Amino acid sequence: MNLKPYEHHVHYYETDKMGVVHHSNFIRWMEEARVYLMSEIGFSYKRLEDEGIISPVIGVECDYKVMVNFDDTVLIDVSEEFYNGIKMTIKYTMTDKSTGKLFAVGKSRHCFLNKEGRPVNLK
């Protein structure tokens, strides 16, 4: 599936005293992009939760390449790297909308559980 990248315009409050985006915001943007991805492929978080399924984060990583500044627009390409019905790994590639410069790459790992915390196979 070829999805349009998720787009995030950097807000002033996301920057730190050094004038660059604080590193923790990249993880938030990854979550925004993941929610977008899940909706686009027909598995919105709302739908999963309505069906009694939760999807906790079991791991996250982000490699920062270039600083991001206020007023930049970040494109986040999201793709499924691994999925076996119980666990899933999502890959994120964050680039500058105007220049294509690579800002960061990241991954998040998730599992699917019922509300009692037992694994659920979505396949």
How should each PLM-predicted stretch be described?
Residues M1-G59, N114-K123:
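Hot-dog-fold acyl-thioester-processing enzymes
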Residues L37-Y83, K87-M88, V105:
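Hydrophobic beta-strand-centered segment that forms part of the acyl-chain substrate-binding groove
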